[in-house]
Amino acid sequence: MAETIIAPASPGGRGGVAVIRISGKEASHIGKSLCSSLPKPWSLKPCFVVNKQKEIIDQGLVAFFRAPKSYTGEDVVEIHCHGNPLIVDSVVSSGIFFGARLAEPGEFTKRAFLNNKIDLAQAESVADLIASETSQALRGA
């Protein structure tokens, strides 16, 4: 798990807020490249998210979670921005430019499992929650 990954942690489409997660050894470096600075661990602060030309993409919030006290067990940065797909794509593309790679579906949860943050039953429950299409399936997850 040497590579730092980035992906939206919120569902696709339009919405008021989107969460973009970065996880791995370079998460703080990439987060600083996108937001100029990070808050103290386990807190939020306002930020202007910028692209590789240092042009402002959006204004939002940034959170930092230091390993091992994060969802994945790695350093994690979460950027909370407006939920326009163009903004989300621009933030993710900029994170890739700064050194992350696009996460595969379920990869944040896979890392949490591999880093002993969750067990197999919990990982399967996360997948079931995300895939639930009925109230009954949601309760069963």
Walk through the language-model features, giving the residues of each.
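A glycine-rich (often HGG/GG-containing) alpha/beta subdomain
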Residues: M1-G140
